[in-house]
Amino acid sequence: MLQPKRTKYRKQMKGRNRGLALRGSKISFGEFGLKAVERGRLTARQIEAARRAMTRHIKRGGKIWIRVFPDKPITQKPLEVRQGKGKGSVEYWVAQIQPGKVLFEMEGVSKELAMEAFDLAKAKLPFKVMFEERTVM
């Protein structure tokens, strides 16, 4: 599971997920990519589930890049605990995703195989994504 090795602060404020992805919006490593259409949170478990689905489908034929990293800690209080007494402990890590962000990239496989693999990954993600091909300028 992906998570930071160490952070300056253990807990973060909730914040807001606004705007469009300007950085990381172009395919820069592989030939094909999976791009977010909606905004949302992507947990480390969801990233791992999508990666496994793609890797199993391409049978280790091509190469996959994960372009997102879960660097935001999400805290939760235990069940049946009254409010107050401080912020809860860190339960999991998320990556905040804006529309236009490239999540995964792939190369070394045919377009059909890449589309099938990305379709399997799509089912593991909590928001709409689209398949994109690298454009050569």
Swiss-Prot record:
Q: Which GO terms describe its molecular function?
A: rRNA binding; structural constituent of ribosome; tRNA binding
The reply to whether RNA-binding figures as a keyword in the UniProt entry is yes
Q: Which domain of life is it from?
A: Bacteria
Family matches, as InterPro entries: Ribosomal_uL16 (IPR047873), Ribosomal_uL16_bact-type (IPR000114), Ribosomal_uL16_CS (IPR020798), Ribosomal_uL16_dom (IPR016180), Ribosomal_uL16_sf (IPR036920)
The record ties this protein, via Gene3D superfamilies, to:
Ribosomal protein L10e/L16
State the Gene Ontology BP annotations.
translation
Q: Which GO terms describe its cellular component?
A: cytosolic large ribosomal subunit
UniProt keywords, alphabetically? Ribonucleoprotein, Ribosomal protein, RNA-binding, rRNA-binding, tRNA-binding
Report the coiled-coil segments. none
**Its job:** Binds 23S rRNA and is also seen to make contacts with the A and possibly P site tRNAs.
Subunit field text:
Part of the 50S ribosomal subunit.
Q: Which family does it belong to?
A: Belongs to the universal ribosomal protein uL16 family.
This protein is called what?
Large ribosomal subunit protein uL16
Question: Which species is the source of this protein?
Answer: Legionella pneumophila subsp. pneumophila (strain Philadelphia 1 / ATCC 33152 / DSM 7513)
The upper taxonomy is: Bacteria, Pseudomonadati, Pseudomonadota, Gammaproteobacteria, Legionellales
